[in-house]
Amino acid sequence: MQTQNIVKSYVAASTIAEFDLVKFDANGKIAQCGAADATSALILGIAQRGCAAGEVTDVLIQGVSRAKLGAIAAFENSGDCLLTAAASGKLDSAASTNFVVARILPNINSTASADGDQGEVLFFGPVVVKA
């Protein structure tokens, strides 16, 4: 199966780890997302490799990628599979009024996550606010 991913290069404003969720800052650079960004439309995508401040890194802005996850009890729960920004560049289950930016892609070996685990997600950006 072929996947169409959209990946672009951006300059980092600060240190970014591989598979961090990132956002635009006021200078047009990218920075790691935090939990406060769950209600922000500035979320851009998922860093495809780590970098230091001032370096360039590739960011997946639409498509399938690995991502850092928070503790998600059960991927099969419809509310838990819709993801938003969480602490330290992670994705976690979206709450009401959060921008849903991705959905988890579970498989037989991956049905839940502990805090800091990596998982496969479909990232589509901040287009829907969870009601």
Give the label of every model feature segment:
Residues 1-131:
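Surface-exposed, low-hydrophobicity beta-strand/loop segments enriched in small/polar/acidic residues
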